[in-house]
Every structure is written in structure tokens, then in C-alpha cells.
Regions:
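A charged, aromatic-enriched C-terminal amphipathic alpha-helix characteristic of glycosyltransferases
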Residues: 339-395
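A short, charged/proline- and glycine-enriched loop
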Residues: 1-5, 9-10, 75, 193-202
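N-terminal subdomain of nucleotide-sugar transferases
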Residues: 1-47, 221-231
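Conserved catalytic-core segment of nucleotide-activated headgroup transferases in glycan assembly
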Residues: 18-25, 151, 157-258, 262-263
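A short, active-site helix/loop in glycosyltransferases that binds the activated sugar's phosphate group
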Residues: 116-188, 361-362
Length: 395
């Protein structure tokens, strides 16, 4: 049995799982690897800030085994650097102390865009370091990053950069849903939302922290939908505080119909399950070259209508192409009018799509086993590394 450590960096025992997606990425990968024969995964915290891991609130540590990296490093056969990464200097020091694991850099975000924006816009004195370690045996990255990052990763890390299947699991959505329902909240599913078209509430969940995940395209879509006769109650922009404090932004949108009629509002950032219980009927999304995201899968898993431009799930939800805002507006209008008469078909279609990202996709699980095996015996398994979005696996 080979031991695989997946890095996380905890800020405190009280840290929420829902602050950002990176801890979820680690947990999803943990669940998958523990389904693979011959491998056992643990989560390894590199922060040094937690004294008692049994007290962390992020997850149940009897299910998600979490250890101090520095206490278990020499026991690892594979180190997957996911939430946190080490410099070459760090790795050399670990090796002097007996560390001998295979090292995989696992990238879950669009690092090219994130790092370039950091160089251009951040305060150079406060900007966090960019770890371009060349101590990795391989770089793995999820499919939606391929366009911007394949060559970038290979060059900066001076090793093979391999696209790997996207991993998702409804574990935490189910857990949070159960917690809310046990405390007396409404059942978290679309059947408990507003019934009449003119009462439908639209929401977007883009974090508005870079150009990839930004709400301006959605404002354009909702505005045009209103102009062509779509009926709805309002459109709420989650994580919109910074935008709506920007004078230039407010002056710009003041000419829009959704602003004049008081239909656009903003909220803070919330766990998606919590806000879906109270304030949402339709979810609309636009992300730039990011055609897979937990947001899409979570929303559809809970049965909510999703209007999106994610071409790797164009066979689910309500899809519009790329930056075609007017097309998105027509798709939104049609969904508002017809979705409630199409619930069963919508759910069945989405269920088939969702399963290709979970450990029910046995081909994907087997591919991850082959990837791990090949770290120890290069070439043991022949893999094409040509990703097919329709199967979430290699061709």
C-alpha cells in the first residue's frame, strides 16, 4: 500500500471549507485516491498553525485523515502539491532529512492568468511568492486549464505537464444539505422555489476576483433578457461588494434597465447550499475559458436550472456559447418560461453528466491508478493524455 499525501494549508482550526475551492479540490482528490487499489491518501497540512487536528471544523477528521506534513513527510510515497507548494530549496532540505517521495504538482486554478495578474496589479511588496519549483516529477493539471497553461507549466517546472480528468464529488453538498434540513430549513432543491415566472429570482456566484470569473458578462445577459421581454423578480450578484462600491461601475450600469427598475442587487459571498435554500430560483454563470467548475456541478446536482457557457458540459444545463451575450439572454428567457414543465428530463440529463466526474466513472478511477503507477514504473501503462470531455477520461 503506497501512501499519498495531498497538501493543504490550514489557517486555523475554525477555517471554513467554503472560503475558496482549493480545499475542496484536495478533499475530492482524497476521496478518489482512496478508491484506488494499492494507494491510501491522507491530507497533509503544511501551515504549522494547527495543534490538534481533531478540532478542525473544515471536515470530520475520522473520514478525512489530516496530519502535520512535517511529522509524516518521510512516510510518504507520493506527495501531491495541491493547496500548498514547496520551493526547490525546501525539497532539498526535506531530502537531506530522509524524504524520498515522488512529487506531483497538481494545478487546479488558471495559474497563468492568476500569476500574470499578480505581477501586473499587486503591490510588489505584498504579493505572495510564485513557486516555480523544478523538483517535481510531473505536473498534473485539470482539463479546463489546458489552453492557457499546458506549455507554461511544462516550461516553468521543467518537466512533463499532463492533463488529468476532473474530479468532483457531492459529499460536502449532501452533508451541508442534511445539516440545513435537520435545523429546520427548507429542503434544498428546486421544487421549493418560486412558482410563477415573474417571481423567479436569478443569481450569479462568480467570485469577481479576476477576469476569468467576473459578473459583467452576466449583467449584459440579464439586461438584454429584460429588453427582449423576459420576466423575473430580480438578479443578485454574489461577491459583488467591491464592484458596487466602484463609482465608475455604478455610473456605467446606471443607464441599464435592470438598474433603473431596481432589479439588480448585490450580496456578499455565501456557501452555495445555504443561499440556495432562501434566495435563488435560477443560476446564471459566465467564465472565460473555464469550462469546468464545481459551481456548475453543485448547482445542477441540487436540481437548479443553470444557464452557462461551459462547453465541456454543453450537454447539461442551459448552454450558450462563449461571449455571445444575446444568445445567453434568449436562453435565459426561454429557460424562465419553460423550465418548470421540464424538470424530470432536466434532472435525468444532468445526472448522467454529473456521474462522469465522480468515482462512479470507473474509467476515470482506473486512469488515476495508471497515472500513479507510472510515477514508479514509467511507461508501465500506455496513456494517450488526450482528454475527451464527453467521458472525462483519455481517448
Amino acid at each position: 500500500m503506497k501512501l499519498v499525501g495531498i497538501t493543504i494549508g490550514l489557517k486555523s482550526e475554525d477555517e471554513s471549507l467554503w472560503v475558496n475551492g482549493i480545499k475542496l479540490n484536495a478533499a475530492m482528490l482524497y476521496l478518489l485516491i482512496n478508491k484506488i487499489d494499492g494507494y491510501k491518501a491522507i491530507l497533509v497540512d503544511t501551515s504549522g498553525k494547527v495543534k490538534d487536528y481533531s478540532k478542525i471544523k473544515m471536515w470530520d477528521t475520522s473520514t478525512f485523515i489530516t496530519k502535520d506534513f512535517y511529522k509524516v513527510a518521510n512516510d510518504l510515497d507520493v506527495l501531491i502539491q495541491l493547496s500548498t507548494s514547496f520551493s526547490d530549496q525546501d525539497i532539498n532540505l526535506f531530502k537531506q532529512d530522509g524524504f524520498n517521495a515522488k512529487i506531483v504538482k497538481y494545478n487546479c486554478g488558471n495559474n497563468y492568468v492568476i500569476e500574470m495578474e499578480r505581477i501586473i496589479f499587486d503591490d510588489p511588496e505584498k504579493s505572495p511568492p510564485m513557486t516555480w519549483s523544478q523538483s517535481c516529477d510531473q505536473v498534473w493539471y485539470i482539463p479546463q486549464q489546458h489552453k492557457h497553461n499546458h506549455d507554461y507549466y511544462s516550461i516553468v517546472h521543467n518537466t512533463d505537464a499532463l492533463v488529468v480528468p476532473f474530479v468532483w464529488d457531492p459529499y460536502f453538498i449532501d452533508l451541508r444539505k442534511k445539516q440545513l434540513e435537520e435545523t429546520g430549513n427548507n429542503t434544498v432543491d428546486y421544487s421549493h422555489t418560486s412558482s410563477t415566472i415573474d417571481a423567479k429570482r436569478i443569481m450569479s456566484f462568480e467570485p469577481n476576483n479576476n477576469v476569468i470569473k467576473f459578473s459583467m458578462p452576466l449583467i449584459m445577459i440579464v439586461e438584454h433578457a429584460l429588453r427582449i421581454g423576459a420576466s423575473f423578480k430580480d438578479y443578485k450578484v454574489c461577491s459583488g461588494q467591491r464592484m458596487f462600491k466602484n463609482k465608475a461601475f455604478l455610473e456605467a450600469i446606471s443607464s441599464l434597465e435592470i438598474y433603473k427598475h431596481g432589479k439588480i442587487k448585490y450580496l456578499g459571498r455565501y456557501p452555495i447550499v445555504d443561499i440556495l435554500t432562501t434566495d435563488v430560483d435560477f443560476v446564471i454563470s459566465h467564465q472565460w475559458d473555464n469550462p469546468l467548475n464545481y459551481l456548475y456541478l453543485d448547482v445542477m446536482y441540487l436540481g437548479y436550472p443553470l444557464i452557462h457557457n461551459a462547453h465541456m458540459i454543453k450537454d447539461a444545463g442551459y448552454y450558450y456559447d462563449d461571449f455571445n451575450f444575446k444568445e445567453g439572454a434568449h436562453i435565459l428567457k426561454e429557460a424562465l418560461q419553460k423550465h418548470d414543465s421540464n424538470l424530470l428530463e432536466y434532472a435525468e440529463k444532468n445526472k448522467t453528466v454529473l456521474e462522469r466526474y465522480t468515482n462512479k466513472n470507473f474509467g476515470m478511477v482506473e486512469t488515476y491508478k495508471k497515472l500513479l503507477d507510472n510515477l514508479f514504473e514509467p511507461g508501465k501503462h500506455e496513456l494517450s493524455y488526450k482528454y475527451n470531455w464527453k467521458t472525462n477520461d483519455y481517448e
